[in-house]
Amino acid sequence: MANPKQLFRRNTEWWDHVERSLVTDLLINGKVTTTLERAKRIRSNAEKMITLGKKNTLASRRQAAKYLRLIATENKNKNSLQYLFDVVAPKYVERNGGYTRITKLANRAGDNAKMAIIELV
């Protein structure tokens, strides 16, 4: 059996960066195509960010700002944090969890990796 610490051949700093980037892209674009493992890993963090957006307090804004990457959206006037609190979170006020959906796709041609689309419901 492989050494558990070397199972994915990546360090935790790399995983944290990838997860933050994918969650930010998911919240801004609405869906992301990635590997199945990455989709499963970012699902919980994306749902936590939407829950923080629903609370809409100063503390929740600071917690979300600590996690999300601050990149500009299409209209150039709002960053990802403002987009989460002003556009994404109000859509889910009546919903108690289950904000994302993972749909499996065919395996990737180059390395036969399991692919999936994670999208906001």
From Swiss-Prot:
One of its GO terms (cellular component) is cytosolic large ribosomal subunit. It comes from the Bacteria. One of its GO terms (molecular function) is structural constituent of ribosome. It holds the Pfam family Ribosomal_L17. InterPro entries: Ribosomal_bL17, Ribosomal_bL17_sf. Transmembrane segments: none annotated. Keywords: Ribonucleoprotein, Ribosomal protein. One of its GO terms (biological process) is translation. Belongs to the bacterial ribosomal protein bL17 family. Part of the 50S ribosomal subunit. Contacts protein L32. This is Large ribosomal subunit protein bL17. It comes from Metamycoplasma hominis (strain ATCC 23114 / DSM 25592 / NBRC 14850 / NCTC 10111 / PG21). The gene is rplQ.
